[in-house]
Amino acid sequence: MNKYLFDHKIWSTPYYFYCEEDCHRLFLSFIEGRTFEKPTSNAEENVQETEAGESFTLNPGEDFQNCFPRQRIL
């Protein structure tokens, strides 16, 4: 609906509309190789120092890409 309104200049928006495959590809490019830290809160006072600040890196592998069966793997 929004795409139709945007294309016919009925509703202007700063957002770009991606097709399903482009959206998925863009999402994978955002998360690939990124390292994230596990959030800590002040309420977790009994957490050992080794547990706080745990980090992990996201690399979308075959299992993750299979969540999107219509997506072509590049």
Swiss-Prot record:
It comes from the Eukaryota. It holds the Pfam family DUP. This is DUP240 protein DFP2. GO terms for cellular component: cytoplasm; membrane. It is found in: Cytoplasm; Membrane. Its main location: cytoplasm. Belongs to the DUP/COS family. It is a peripheral membrane protein. It comes from Saccharomyces cerevisiae (strain ATCC 204508 / S288c). InterPro entries: DUP/COS (IPR001142). Disruption phenotype: Cells lacking all 10 proteins of the DUP240 multigene family show no obvious alterations in mating, sporulation and cell growth. Keywords: Cytoplasm, Membrane.
